[in-house]
């Protein structure tokens, strides 16, 4: 079974290129969700990426654990170790990503412990993705989350 990947030509007409369906690339794994256009898998992305052939992924979308000051049950890395920790994962994404593929990364900022200043770990991570892995930064998006204060309350002006 194949699926069609959309590519736009210079005159903005759509052309379709045949690509393998994820179920053909990961025959031993059962998709969490699947359509004729693709599939989503639930699991440890580091293990799943290792099973994928080079250049076989059109979209990698992830929200890894943030470098927080307190430990979460799912595990998180200290900001001083974050860049190297994340780059090992990002190199696998880069290997598996198709030449025309996209990598969407949701990475949150944090404040320096005990100070009214922001950490730069997320900026260092983005720079390392470009300089050390080979990604191209295409766009940054900032989203509004009304559920949480964006900083420790004592440092905010309300």
Predicted regions and their residues:
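Core catalytic lobe of class I
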Residues: 1-158
